Amino acid sequence: MTPGPTIGRAMVAALALAVSTAAWAGPMQDLAFTQRQGAIVPLDARFTDTAGRTLPLGAFMDGHPAILSIGYYTCPNLCALEREDLLHALDAGGLKTPDDYTLIVVSIDPAETAAMARQARQDDLASHATPGADRGWHFLVGQAASIARLSQAVGFHARYDPALKQYLHPMGLVFMTPAGMVSGYVLGVGYRPGDVRQALARAAAGQRAEASPVLLLCFHYDAATGRYTLAVRKLLRLGALMTVLTLATLLGMAHWRRAR
């Protein structure tokens, strides 16, 4: 049986936790986050929210530590899963919005509309009825110039593949201080509540986190063939290799102990 996209995504999410960016030399490396702890995001860059208001980014942060999720609302792959994992971690960690955090979701596609952002927000609220979301969750769209300024500030790299008709981009969250400084990153998907809570605590305190080595890319899964594109296939191969190496190490240790 050909594995479905949901199963495949879960496999990739699990493998991503064990794969470092060092293994990604090659054409896909330029899609990793360039982690820029200490950088200041463009608080004057203007974005449009689900109510159709166009405001500076700083107006949406409103003096709280912020979690930035960058993707696009019509993404057929992992963008919605990233938000789902984040919201689950926030709920499980007992974190409240807007007191503990502000969630800012930004589309990298300048063609997407406020109506698309509104639908994505409604979908997320349907699965996570979060008190305070009316004040603490901001799903935004923007013009290309504003998107580019924000992406550059946080080290987010993406490119559009006309053959796939999809954006190729990294998966992960950016944590920002109330003043708009990049505090740290939690990359991949499958976020643990403790990691999210710790990242928010650092951001609230104005601290910088260490760089995260994990890389996961969001793009094409071919449901017809059950195959992933090049980058994700590499993840699967690397995961298999790591499993073999781990088993070999355990067997070697067992043999060494018996030999003693």
Task: Tell me what each language-model feature is.
Residues 1-12:
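Bacterial N-terminal signal peptides that target proteins for export
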Residues 20-23:
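N-terminal signal peptide c-region/cleavage motif recognized by signal peptidases
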Residues 26-58, 84-88:
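N-terminal "domain-start" segment that seeds a small globular fold
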Residues 56-86, 103-104:
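Short active-site neighborhood of thiol/selenol oxidoreductases, capturing the structured segment around
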Residues 83-147:
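Structural microenvironment flanking redox-active thiols in thiol-disulfide oxidoreductases
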Residues 160-218:
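Extracytoplasmic/lumenal ectodomains and periplasmic regions of secretory and membrane proteins
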Residues 222-243:
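Juxtamembrane/start-of-transmembrane alpha-helix segments at the extracytoplasmic/lumenal side
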Residues 246-260:
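Juxtamembrane interface at the cytosolic side of transmembrane helices
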